[in-house]
Amino acid sequence: MAQLGAVVAVASSFFCASLFSAVHKIEEGHIGVYYRGGALLTSTSGPGFHLMLPFITSYKSVQTTLQTDEVKNVPCGTSGGVMIYFDRIEVVNFLVPNAVYDIVKNYTADYDKALIFNKIHHELNQFCSVHTLQEVYIELFDQIDENLKLALQQDLTSMAPGLVIQAVRVTKPNIPEAIRRNYELMESEKTKLLIAAQKQKVVEKEAETERKKALIEAEKVAQVAEITYGQKVMEKETEKKISEIEDAAFLAREKAKADAECYTAMKIAEANKLKLTPEYLQLMKYKAIASNSKIYFGKDIPNMFMDSAGSVSKQFEGLADKLSFGLEDEPLETATKEN
């Protein structure tokens, strides 16, 4: 019985160990590949729990999501013979799930060592060998990332389709201390030169601004002067027009006044000519004698009413003719007294 119990215990232990080794788990973002007797099996498995033959079959988990491979301390010799070192080069890549079996079969599960690490060393040394330290360290440093990515992807497309390079990041290389100090001094002098150039640009810009400001101010003054001059010219022209209008109005008034006076004189002359008839003159004579308070006696008193009437009427007819032609007339009383 004791031996039977021992056999059962050993069998149970063996069964538990077999079951434990047969059950395995594949994480999300990974693909499981299987080996049996050292040979790669064609079957693969996705994320989850799976069973395999214990002690005979083994598995490896291959990541298919984005991963970053770091290549450290890569030596590089420039065309001038200076040895420099890149501390760290990061390669971001991912593996297409359908290409896992072919890549693992050709390059093992550690495919990144053969396809990425060794390729980085090779491409970087190729780049440094055809460029000077100045080009690698300063002038072409910003192109190293893109050049490495393109070179890697071009080779992987033909050697391992399904392995995609997402990005490559290269740190600044380490150069000899003496050369580094020289570059620092050079950068310092370059910075000073840039600062001086910027200051000069600022001064030139300020001078240009002042010049434009003065030009604008001068243009403003000129425009104000032009506007003022135009206003004065318009005022003078307005005054001239007003004066011409006033002169024309005065001339028209004077002309109208002269025409009215001439017309009045002509009408008066015509009225006097019509009025100075012999009968009217005889009547005026009688009125004058009647209003005279002094009467002289003599032999000629009767004749003054008879004879002098004809001569006086003739004189007044001549006077009326003179008035009709616009000549100066003598007062009626003066003509009467002279007679």
From Swiss-Prot:
Protein's membrane topology: Single-pass type II membrane protein
Pfam families: Band_7 (PF01145)
Effect on the protein upon substituting residue 180 to C: In SPG18B; uncertain significance
Gene3D superfamilies, sorted: Band 7 domain (3.30.479.30)
Glycosylation sites: 106
Residue segments, region Interaction with ERLIN1: 177-309
Lumenal side: 25-339
Impact upon substituting residue 129 to T: In SPG18A; likely pathogenic
Record topological domains on the Cytoplasmic side: 1-3
Effect in UniProt of substituting residue 106 to Q: Loss of glycosylation
Domain of life: Eukaryota
One GO term of the biological process aspect: negative regulation of cholesterol biosynthetic process
GO cellular component: cytosol; endoplasmic reticulum; endoplasmic reticulum membrane; membrane raft; plasma membrane; protein-containing complex
Tissue: Ubiquitous.
InterPro entries from the UniProt entry: Band_7 (IPR001107), Band_7/SPFH_dom_sf (IPR036013), Erlin1/2 (IPR033294)
Modified positions (N6-acetyllysine) in chain numbering: 267
UniProt-recorded Gene Ontology molecular function terms: cholesterol binding; ubiquitin protein ligase binding
Subcellular localization, as worded in the UniProt entry: Endoplasmic reticulum membrane
Keywords carried by this UniProt record: Acetylation, Cholesterol metabolism, Disease variant, Endoplasmic reticulum, Glycoprotein, Hereditary spastic paraplegia, Lipid metabolism, Membrane, Neurodegeneration, Signal-anchor, Steroid metabolism, Sterol metabolism, Transmembrane, Transmembrane helix
Segments traversing the membrane: 4-24
Disease: Spastic paraplegia 18B, autosomal recessive: A form of spastic paraplegia, a neurodegenerative disorder characterized by a slow, gradual, progressive weakness and spasticity of the lower limbs. Rate of progression and the severity of symptoms are quite variable. Initial symptoms may include difficulty with balance, weakness and stiffness in the legs, muscle spasms, and dragging the toes when walking. In some forms of the disorder, bladder symptoms (such as incontinence) may appear, or the weakness and stiffness may spread to other parts of the body.
Protein family (similarity comment): Belongs to the band 7/mec-2 family.
Function: Component of the ERLIN1/ERLIN2 complex which mediates the endoplasmic reticulum-associated degradation (ERAD) of inositol 1,4,5-trisphosphate receptors (IP3Rs) such as ITPR1. Promotes sterol-accelerated ERAD of HMGCR probably implicating an AMFR/gp78-containing ubiquitin ligase complex. Involved in regulation of cellular cholesterol homeostasis by regulation the SREBP signaling pathway. May promote ER retention of the SCAP-SREBF complex.
Subunit and partners: Forms a heteromeric complex with ERLIN1. In complex with ERLIN1, interacts with RNF170. Interacts with activated ITPR1, independently of the degree of ITPR1 polyubiquitination. Interacts with SCAP, INSIG1, SREBF1 and SREBF2 under cholesterol sufficiency conditions; indicative for an association with the SCAP-SREBP-INSIG complex. Probably part of an AMFR/gp78 and INSIG1-containing ubiquitin ligase complex involved in ERAD of HMGCR. Interacts with TMUB1; TMUB1 bridges the association with AMFR. Interacts with SYVN1 and RNF139. Interacts with TMEM259. Interacts with TMEM41B.
Protein's recorded name: Erlin-2
Native species: Homo sapiens
